[in-house]
UniProtKB/Swiss-Prot annotation:
EC number: 6.1.1.15
Keyword tRNA-binding: no
Name assigned to this protein: Proline--tRNA ligase
Keyword line: Aminoacyl-tRNA synthetase, ATP-binding, Cytoplasm, Ligase, Nucleotide-binding, Protein biosynthesis
Gene Ontology terms: cellular component: cytosol
Length: 581
């Protein structure tokens, strides 16, 4: 591509109120232009980056057997009413009527559409599992769009869906997606972490978020070194899977500490860990709660969870027979029952978080329902030694949050991907459809897997930039190589060399047409500034002085290092450089 035939669209100045840095650089480098609040046009440079990200996603999704489809953004309202999300979704769901007064929505997601499609197309259980995905535009009527395309009203997503007649099949696909997302984000060049998450209004039981590190967000994530067990058990907090919990220290949080006093609670745990010279990964806390069941009977329950985890009643209510509200008991409320806390195997029902249950493989647990990922109901537990109960220090008044942060590294993050095991939330209609067609009585479960493609672009910029502009990872750069001929219209040998190299390099598969030849009649300073701003990884500089020595200059954008290469070796040099990157 020649700059004289390209819409470069770089600008020097942008509004001072424009933030964050990724949005500034996307405007300055001519990637996007704002049309209205939360709505953007993608210019050629930005679109080239988007397409390369999409190509990576296509390749990796195809490797695990997902088939691409394309569904309309306009969706009939009756599908959303059937799923119950017509009223649940809120004002972000843009509703409208057509000329015949039929109700529609602009789809923020496509669960309803895909289940309707599968319901009408699938005839037999022999066609399962079904794995489909699309890359498509979504629309959410955000109240406060901000940070450029990071939080916009119109955006591009990859959303995948899988349908299964066996739970194990769903879990295997979920695991494959989990692994493939790691490959996708690493190829793109993102630094990220994975956290267990609440499914929110999408629904389901099991859910993981992929979070990119991003300094300009208020969302904080405690970071652990992660591995993922295929049996859907947990994300461990060490580099290997050999977590051995020799001593189980139970911290009963029955004191009158409010739920908002997270720092106070964590400080107590920290002192417990220091006292026993243990690790936070090896510490379990025991929370006493008061729960009403479906028979309106109130009972005491205990939750055994790892010390670093926060109590989340949204996860707890997913267990059958439990009804909100859930109350954490204070010391006064439970004084008469205090003797029940001295051993873990007491008459008080114990619900063990899945992370704890799977980590404690030295012990035998009975009646664990492995389909419930967040909390496990068990009827019996073994006797455990060295149990500490009711550790409570009421004289602690000042909280040093820095001490807690040393135990749990905190990073600012933003969501770039989300995967769900939806269960039967959307697939019941498919069961009934197939049963009507051929009387197959199936138990279909569903998975959903999303990636925010337009959000990835600014996230990469946030992690890869300097004072001169963007520094694109090689695989998603708008161009892999830039050729800057200095005063090419003044020196004929500079022009001829630039044209010859442009032609030769374009024929090499590893480079192809990913070359930008800056053939403008511009001051060299402007050319260097624009190419650095665009973030093209590899830069070739051709000048009259260097050609006199049969040399050209090569600049690596990431480091800024310039080296001179013999003209007769430059093709081989660039080919090897690009293949290694």
């Amino acid at each position: 591509m020649r700059t004289t035939q390209y819409l470069l669209a770089t600008i020097k100045e942008i509004p001072k109120s424009c933030e964050p840095i990724s949005h500034q650089l996307m405007l300055r480098s001519g990637m996007v232009r704002q049309i209205s609040s939360g709505v953007y046009t993608w210019l050629p440079t930005g679109l080239r980056v988007l397409k390369k990200i999409e190509n990576i996603i296509h390749e990796e999704m195809n490797k695990i057997g997902f088939l691409e489809i394309f569904m309309p953004i306009t969706q009939p309202a009756n599908l959303w009413k059937q799923s119950g999300r017509w009223s649940e979704y809120g004002l972000e769901l843009l509703r409208f009527k057509n000329r015949t007064n039929q109700k529609f929505v602009l789809g923020p997601t496509h669960e309803e559409m895909i289940t309707d499609l599968v319901c009408n197309e699938i005839l037999s259980h022999k066609q399962f599992p079904i794995k489909l995905y699309q890359i498509n535009t979504k629309y959410r009527d955000e109240a406060r769009p901000q940070f450029g395309v990071i939080r916009s009203k119109e955006f591009i997503m990859k959303d995948g869906y899988s349908f299964h007649i066996h739970q194990k099949s769903l879990e295997d696909t979920y695991y494959n997606i989990y692994q493939q997302y790691h490959i996708i984000f690493k190829r793109i060049g993102l630094k990220f972490c994975v956290v267990q998450a609440d499914p929110g209004n999408i629904g389901g039981i099991v859910s993981h978020e992929f979070q990119a590190y991003y300094n300009n967000t208020q969302n904080e994530t405690a970071i652990f070194t992660e591995t993922f067990n295929k049996d859907m058990s947990n994300i461990n907090t060490r580099k290997n899977n050999d977590i051995v919990i020799n001593n189980i220290h139970i911290l009963n949080t029955i004191q009158t500490i409010k739920l908002t006093s997270a720092d106070f609670h964590n400080l107590i745990i920290m002192r417990l860990i220091n006292y026993y010279k243990s690790f936070i990964q090896e510490t379990i806390k025991n929370i006493i709660i008061y729960i009403k069941n479906k028979n309106n009977i109130y009972n005491l329950h205990r939750i055994a969870t790892q010390a670093y985890e926060k109590f989340n009643d949204l996860k707890l209510v997913k267990i059958p027979d439990i009804i909100i509200p859930i109350s954490i008991l204070n010391k006064k409320n439970i004084e008469i029952k205090l003797n029940l806390l001295k051993l873990i195997n007491t008459p008080v029902p114990l619900m063990i978080n899945y992370n704890v249950a799977t980590a404690m493989y030295d012990f035998i647990f009975h009646n664990i329902n492995i389909n419930k990922n967040y909390c496990m109901k068990i009827n019996q537990t073994p006797n455990l030694s060295k149990i500490t109960t009711n550790l409570y220090e009421s004289n602690i008044k000042k909280i040093n949050t820095n001490q807690i942060r040393k135990l749990l590294p905190i990073r600012n993050t933003i969501e770039i991907g989300h995967i769900f095991q939806l269960g039967k939330k959307y697939s019941n209609c498919i069961n009934s459809c197939i049963q009507k067609k051929n009387k197959d009585n199936l138990n279909i479960t569903m998975g959903c897997y999303g990636i925010g493609i337009t959000r990835i672009v600014p996230m990469v910029i946030e992690q890869h930039h300097d004072k001169h502009g963007i520094i694109w990872p090689n695989e998603i750069a708008p161009f892999k190589l830039a050729i800057i001929p200095i005063n090419m219209y003044r020196f004929i040998n500079v022009q001829n060399t630039a044209e010859e190299l442009y032609t030769q390099l374009s024929s090499i598969p590893v480079i192809g047409f990913d070359i930008l030849l800056d053939d403008r009649k511009e001051n060299p300073g402007i050319m260097f500034t624009d190419i650095d701003l665009l973030g093209i990884p590899h830069i070739l500089i051709i000048s009259e002085r260097n050609l006199n020595n049969q040399e050209v200059e090569y600049k690596y954008r990431k480091t800024g290092i310039i080296q001179k290469i013999k003209l007769n070796l430059i093709i081989q040099f660039l080919t090897e450089k690009l293949m290694n990157n």
